[in-house]
Regions:
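Extended, loop-rich substrate-binding clefts of extracytoplasmic carbohydrate-active enzymes
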Residues: 1-11
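Beta-strand secondary-structure signal
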Residues: 4, 15-19, 106-110
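Intrinsically disordered, low-complexity segments enriched in polar/charged residues with Gly/Pro
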Residues: 6-7, 48-50, 82-85
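Acidic (Asp/Glu-rich), glycine- and aromatic
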Residues: 9-49
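A short linear-motif detector with a strong N-terminal bias
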Residues: 17, 50-52, 85-90
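A contiguous pocket-lining binding segment that forms or flanks enzyme active sites
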Residues: 40-64
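Beta-strand-rich recognition/accessory modules
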Residues: 63-133
Length: 133
């Protein structure tokens, strides 16, 4: 079994590709990934709360203390969005499709920053980019 990731800049953000190759003789199923975006060291985002998070699966976004700077991430195929205030962090966790012997499965991810107040409009703009295809 092998896996890897590739990250490339595009459209003002990062497009991420994660892959899993099944070189075993057994099928792999129910493989979930936790991708944690931690804010502890990011000035303005380090507040330990979930009140600054917006969940629009597969997207999750977090704003700074002023509510004008946002970090946005998403992964597909999507399994769940969640946040952990004590960290503080946010997750858009994907799940690999079942992977038969000899197969390779892929996940697609996005990360970007946004400055402004129309976060829903920005998320729609990101969706319209088609980064997950």
């Amino acid at each position: 079994i092998s896996f890897g990731t590739h990250v490339a800049g595009a459209h003002g953000g990062l497009i991420m590709d994660m892959w899993l190759r099944n070189g075993s003789e057994a099928a792999l199923d129910d493989l979930r990934v936790q991708n944690c975006v931690m804010f502890r060291e990011l000035a303005g985002f380090e507040v330990q709360t979930n009140d600054n998070k917006l969940l629009l699966p597969p997207y999750i976004a977090c704003h700074d203390v002023e509510g004008r700077r946002w970090a946005i991430t998403a992964w597909t195929p999507h399994q769940r969005c969640w946040a952990n205030a004590p960290c503080p962090c946010m997750h858009s966790d994907p799940q690999f499709p079942d992977c038969a012997p000899g197969e390779t499965q892929r996940l697609k991810g996005w990360f970007s920053f946004y400055q402004g107040v129309d976060i829903v409009g920005e998320i729609q703009r990101l969706q319209d980019l088609g980064w997950d295809r």
